[in-house]
């Protein structure tokens, strides 16, 4: 487990005070740098030792066959796996003839710092070689947010006590060996030498390697160039082979003298451009980097982040761990999306190979809601990527004998890659999640151009899918059969409430969008009768309810399923230890499902229903998913269980920083990082937007004395400063200087010329705090020794 002792709690940085080789893979994920196009895991500069080497380009993947013991019609035949591309991070240091390696000699001091304001990873090390030569190494690494194709490293070596001869080998390396993986289905498949050499060249102070994948036929280029500063004589040479380019720097240093190397990196890939064009793209990016210079890249990085934090920062007084974690989460969300530019946002971002680098519903359901309020330009690009896969989704629906478009459950390029139908294709709700993301973007930003450009087509085709999936019974009630909701322990069911409510919302949203754009809708074949059918299905959707218990059923009949014996089954995650034949017919819930419906479709439930539903389902949720704690935090806060909500918020925020789910080594959990923001802003800030108006209803737990968050809404920048007694709204920018929001259920008009302070509404719980399954209580702020072993 990652501890506070090694990673102290600090508001604007993640600092590792000592190097623990047993936690190397986890720290590589925490210290990953990315801009949404390039991703560099936080591997040590010298390349070894490593937990999981990793350099990624968004959507650069290889195809592999999906094995089936017994295949069936409509099963995907091929999977897609992100490729560990050419590694440009490596700078191998030799002191005299001895390699700098933290496993040998003496590491006198070692520290790494991820600076959330500067956007850099800095490493400081004092090392004494086995021959008693001491050097100080300081490296600073960045992946540029301002320049999409550029990364850079400043590497400084200082002699401390004796004259030393120093050699640095700066490399580009392709087809690195990958460590063996476990049988955990969340771990990536291993690709054996996925890159085929196309071209290699050496320049005066750098080199360039070009490769292509064998099956997906994607081509990539990686280039490097160097600036070298050193007193006295220096020798610089470069050589290149198909899988290796190396620039070697040799010099002598007296005590106090320094060798400074700035390594510029450029990456690009394409499925369409020619080899010369891709070569020239990488070369041009290197020239751009050298023109900017190291200081110019640093300044541009900080300026980009200053602008982001001005509209996105969250301040948490009284809970320093959550303070650090929410900023860490926002930083990585920005890194995953800032320059993705019409590529997917994978569930691990570009921090590791977990889930093969696939994007799921996590993107539209958990990540994009946060970015819509903090970095809307990135959301527009992510939605354009999803829309670019619409034809593939239509082809998939046709293959399955359905109308409209069926977006895939997991993918890189847009084709379905899930080999398990019950927790893949049957999770049809992803189509409504995507539709909701388009509608939220329109509502929050006030920008209709994205809907006009591509969103309308997505809304129409997903609505057509729902109409062909569902049916009216003889009583006129509309049903969805054979569906799986967010809870993957209750699969292929009738009338999952979450799915039915989301589908109904999708249908109504599509009909409303067609009214806003009648000519475009007509051109897509939409008729008045079709829109009426959408609305009729939405109005008639079955929402199962148990009158005897006074709770909604997660799906038809759920409250009559067999109760799960939590006392007898205590090894988690259950999907690694229990057969699905036991899980599916029982009242055991992997993650928030009905409870998530109450968050995303809040208006569909009364306060009393929410309170009773939370009480019932809390006792059955085991959180074998990192997507659950944030939702439970939001809904526990809404029904008045503020201290329990704070524990869930703490767990959601610390999943990666404390490696609570034991799989941070495979990459960070983007949705849970987003969940830290959602738990605080949606839970204790009371933010809702499902009725088309910005609704805020703050209420803080005892452990938080002040919650101050910033967000964007229709051109305005709004700061919400909540305390236990009152909340102050400060409006900046925006059209007209006035904005009407809903505060605690009442309309409130804010003006940009003066802040508005108003009392908060006290939340009194209708029921006592619910219990959880034995051993599945949230990781508590007050009992940090509790550790869960859960799954995504």
From Swiss-Prot:
<dbReference type="Pfam" id="PF03632">
    <property type="entry name" value="Glyco_hydro_65m"/>
</dbReference>
<dbReference type="Pfam" id="PF03636">
    <property type="entry name" value="Glyco_hydro_65N"/>
</dbReference>
<keyword id="KW-0378">Hydrolase</keyword>
<feature type="binding site">
    <location>
        <begin position="361"/>
        <end position="362"/>
    </location>
    <ligand>
        <name>substrate</name>
    </ligand>
</feature>
<dbReference type="GO" id="GO:0005975">
    <property type="term" value="P:carbohydrate metabolic process"/>
</dbReference>
<dbReference type="Pfam" id="PF03633">
    <property type="entry name" value="Glyco_hydro_65C"/>
</dbReference>
<keyword id="KW-0326">Glycosidase</keyword>
<feature type="binding site">
    <location>
        <begin position="590"/>
        <end position="591"/>
    </location>
    <ligand>
        <name>substrate</name>
    </ligand>
</feature>
<protein>
    <recommendedName>
        <fullName>Uncharacterized glycosyl hydrolase ML0392</fullName>
        <ecNumber>3.2.1.-</ecNumber>
    </recommendedName>
</protein>
<feature type="region of interest" description="Disordered">
    <location>
        <begin position="753"/>
        <end position="792"/>
    </location>
</feature>
<dbReference type="InterPro" id="IPR017045">
    <property type="entry name" value="Malt_Pase/Glycosyl_Hdrlase"/>
</dbReference>
<dbReference type="InterPro" id="IPR037018">
    <property type="entry name" value="Glyco_hydro_65_N_sf"/>
</dbReference>
<dbReference type="InterPro" id="IPR005196">
    <property type="entry name" value="Glyco_hydro_65_N"/>
</dbReference>
<dbReference type="InterPro" id="IPR005194">
    <property type="entry name" value="Glyco_hydro_65_C"/>
</dbReference>
<comment type="similarity">
    <text>Belongs to the glycosyl hydrolase 65 family.</text>
</comment>
<dbReference type="GO" id="GO:0030246">
    <property type="term" value="F:carbohydrate binding"/>
</dbReference>
<dbReference type="InterPro" id="IPR008928">
    <property type="entry name" value="6-hairpin_glycosidase_sf"/>
</dbReference>
<feature type="active site" description="Proton donor">
    <location>
        <position position="488"/>
    </location>
</feature>
<dbReference type="InterPro" id="IPR005195">
    <property type="entry name" value="Glyco_hydro_65_M"/>
</dbReference>
<dbReference type="GO" id="GO:0016757">
    <property type="term" value="F:glycosyltransferase activity"/>
</dbReference>
<dbReference type="GO" id="GO:0004553">
    <property type="term" value="F:hydrolase activity, hydrolyzing O-glycosyl compounds"/>
</dbReference>
<dbReference type="InterPro" id="IPR011013">
    <property type="entry name" value="Gal_mutarotase_sf_dom"/>
</dbReference>
<feature type="compositionally biased region" description="Pro residues">
    <location>
        <begin position="766"/>
        <end position="776"/>
    </location>
</feature>
<dbReference type="InterPro" id="IPR012341">
    <property type="entry name" value="6hp_glycosidase-like_sf"/>
</dbReference>
């Amino acid at each position: 487990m990652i501890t506070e002792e090694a990673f102290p709690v600090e508001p604007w940085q993640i600092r590792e005070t000592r190097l623990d080789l047993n936690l190397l893979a986890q720290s590589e994920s925490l210290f990953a740098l990315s801009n949404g196009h390039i991703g560099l895991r936080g591997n040590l500069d010298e390349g070894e030792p490593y937990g999981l080497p990793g350099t990624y380009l968004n959507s650069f993947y290889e195809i592999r066959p999906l094995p089936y013991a017994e295949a069936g019609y409509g099963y995907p035949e091929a999977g897609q796996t992100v490729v560990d591309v050419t590694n440009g991070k490596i700078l191998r240091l030799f002191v005299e003839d001895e390699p700098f390696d933290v496993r040998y000699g003496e590491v006198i001091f070692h520290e790494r710092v991820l600076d959330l304001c500067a956007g850099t990873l800095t490493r400081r090390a004092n090392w004494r070689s086995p021959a008693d030569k001491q050097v100080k190494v300081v490296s600073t690494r960045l992946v540029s947010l301002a320049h999409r194709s550029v990364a850079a490293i400043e590497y400084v070596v200082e002699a401390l006590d004796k004259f030393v001869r120093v050699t640095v080998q700066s490399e580009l390396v392709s087809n690195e060996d990958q460590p063996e993986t476990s049988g955990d289905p969340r771990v990536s498949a291993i690709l054996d030498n996925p890159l085929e050499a196309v071209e290699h060249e050496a320049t005066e102070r750098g080199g360039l390697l070009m490769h292509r994948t064998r099956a997906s036929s994607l081509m990539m280029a990686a280039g490097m160039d160097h600036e070298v500063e050193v007193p006295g004589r220096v020798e610089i040479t470069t050589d290149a082979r198909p899988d290796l380019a190396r620039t070697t720097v040799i010099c002598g240093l007296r005590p106090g003298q320094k060798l400074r190397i700035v390594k510029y990196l450029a990456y690009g890939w394409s499925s369409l451009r020619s080899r010369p064009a891709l070569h020239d793209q990488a070369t041009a990016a290197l020239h751009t980097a050298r023109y900017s210079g190291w200081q110019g890249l640093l300044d541009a990085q900080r300026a980009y982040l200053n602008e982001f934090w001005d509209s996105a920062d969250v301040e948490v007084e009284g809970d320093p761990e959550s303070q650090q974690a929410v900023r860490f989460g926002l930083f990585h969300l920005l890194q995953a999306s800032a320059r993705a530019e019409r590529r997917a946002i994978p569930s691990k971002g570009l921090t590791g190979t977990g889930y093969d680098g696939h994007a799921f519903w996590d993107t539209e359901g958990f990540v994009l809601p946060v970015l819509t309020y903090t970095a809307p330009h990135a959301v527009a690009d992510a939605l354009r990527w999803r829309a670019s896969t619409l034809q593939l989704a239509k082809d998939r629906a046709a293959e399955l004998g359905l109308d409209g478009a069926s977006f895939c459950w997991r993918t890189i390029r847009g084709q379905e890659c899930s080999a398990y139908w019950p927790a893949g294709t049957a999770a049809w709700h992803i189509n409504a999640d995507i539709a909701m993301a388009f509608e939220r973007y329109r509502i929050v930003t006030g920008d209709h151009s994205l809907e006009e450009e591509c969103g309308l087509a997505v809304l129409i085709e997903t609505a057509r899918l729902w109409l062909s999936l569902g049916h009216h019974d003889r009583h006129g009630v509309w049903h969805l059969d054979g569906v799986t909701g967010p809870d993957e322990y209750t699969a292929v069911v009738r009338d999952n409430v979450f799915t039915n409510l989301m589908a109904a919302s999708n249908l109504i949203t599509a009909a409303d969008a067609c009214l806003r754009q009648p000519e475009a809708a007509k051109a897509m074949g939409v008729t008045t009768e079709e829109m009426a059918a959408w609305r009729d299905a939405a109005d008639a959707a079955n929402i199962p309810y148990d009158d005897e218990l006074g709770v909604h059923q997660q799906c038809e009949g759920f409250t009559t399923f067999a109760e799960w014996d939590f006392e007898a089954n205590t090894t988690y995650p259950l999907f690694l230890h229990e057969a699905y034949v036991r899980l599916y017919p029982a009242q055991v819930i992997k993650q928030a499902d009905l409870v998530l419906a109450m968050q995303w479709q809040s208006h569909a439930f009364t306060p009393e229903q929410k309170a009773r539903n939370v009480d019932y389902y809390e006792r059955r949720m085991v959180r074998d998913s990192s997507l659950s704690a944030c939702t439970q935090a939001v809904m526990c806060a809404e029904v008045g269980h503020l201290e329990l909500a704070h524990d869930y918020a703490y767990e959601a925020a610390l999943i990666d920083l404390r490696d609570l789910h034991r799989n941070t080594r495979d990459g960070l959990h983007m949705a849970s990082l987003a969940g830290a923001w959602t738990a605080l802003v949606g839970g204790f800030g009371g933010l809702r937007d499902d009725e088309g108006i910005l609704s805020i209803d703050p209420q803080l737990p005892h452990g938080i004395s002040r919650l101050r968050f910033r967000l964007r809404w229709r051109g305005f920048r709004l700061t919400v400063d909540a305390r236990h007694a009152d909340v102050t709204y400060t409006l900046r920018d925006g059209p007209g200087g006035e904005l009407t929001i809903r505060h605690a259920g009442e309309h409130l008009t804010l003006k940009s010329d003066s802040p508005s302070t108003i009392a908060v509404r006290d939340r009194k719980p209708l029921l006592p705090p619910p219990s959880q399954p034995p051993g599945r209580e949230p990781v508590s702020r007050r009992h940090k020794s509790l550790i869960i072993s859960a799954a995504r």
